Amino acid sequence: MWDSSYMQQVSEGLMTGKVPIDQVFGANPLEKLYKRRKPKGTVGLQCSPCLMSKATSTDDIIWDQLIVKRTLADLLIPINRQISDIQSTLSEVTTRVHEIERQLHEITPVLKMGRTLEAISKGMSEMLAKYDHLVISTGRTTAPAAAFDAYLNEHGVPPPQPAIFKDLGVAQQACSKGTMVKNATTDAADKMSKVLELSEETFSKPNLSAKDLALLLFTHLPGNNTPFHILAQVLSKIAYKSGKSGAFLDAFHQILSEGENAQAALTRLSRTFDAFLGVVPPVIRVKNFQTVPRPSQKSLRAVPPNPTIDKGWVCVYSSEQGETRALKI
């Protein structure tokens, strides 16, 4: 029980300063009931080991969770960045695919037109090759022949168009003696003397010279002085000597019409055309191998025991030093 008189005395003593505070608390009758735990030095209030262990384990769990969250955040940041990059890349790829599709739709008619033009070009080249050796007229009664004579009589020289008539005044004038004939007239007469008679055989297979045949083949080949240009010259010469230049040209155009290019056509003919089977390639003498056309130098090989054209050996180069190299396709 509280003692009211004692508490009043204590209050008055504390108010007047007569009673020190330590003395009051030291003489407190409730000291046994209220034991104050004083901290030792600067150490704070201490908890029991059980509470301390619980607090420590809770802090560790919270700290581990915080570390896990930070680790996940660090992992998700680059993943999000990569996903955004992938999305942007996919959008760009989609845009490009749509652009390519649009361009393909625009190119399709151009490709069809290109095939048509290629077919027309092949037909025209074949027609021109035959037209150069075609006799349109064998007499002087046609209107073109009369016009030719009229132009010749008026100007003294043949017209600038090709002279493709056999029996015209220009030929007689070129062959007559005692007359001054200009160079143009002489050239026209020489050309007419080489024109063949019109027949089924000469129309389908004109007897081209080796030079003319090679020039026709060159128009289909890209570049200059390539191994295929040399192959065209060799094949043209062999076909002309065997009398099969017209058949060779027809076979060449036939392969072109099948969709093959000129290089493939020449390679195929060198292996299948009867005039080239088992033929030994010609020998070409050069000062040294540096004088061989540069595009063909990489195709020079050692000469095999029995080279033939149908096995891909075009020609054999022989230098002044006695060395030999074969051109291989």
Swiss-Prot record:
It comes from the Viruses. Residues 204-329 form the VP35 IID domain. InterPro entries: Filo_VP35, VP35_IID, VP35_IID_b-sht, VP35_IID_hlx. Keywords: Coiled coil, Host cytoplasm, Transcription, Viral RNA replication, Virion. One of its GO terms (cellular component) is viral nucleocapsid. Pfam families: Filo_VP35. It is found in: Virion; Host cytoplasm. Changing residue 90 to A: Complete loss of homo-oligomerization. CDD domains: V35-RBD_P-protein-C_like (cd21030). Residues 70-120 form a coiled coil. The keyword Transcription applies. Homooligomer. Homomultimerization via the coiled coil domain is a prerequisite for binding to L. Found in a trimeric complex in which VP35 bridges L and the nucleoprotein. Interacts with NP. Disrupts innate immune signaling in infected host cell. Belongs to the filoviridae polymerase cofactor VP35 family. Plays an essential role in viral RNA synthesis and also a role in suppressing innate immune signaling. This is Polymerase cofactor VP35. It comes from Lake Victoria marburgvirus (strain Musoke-80).
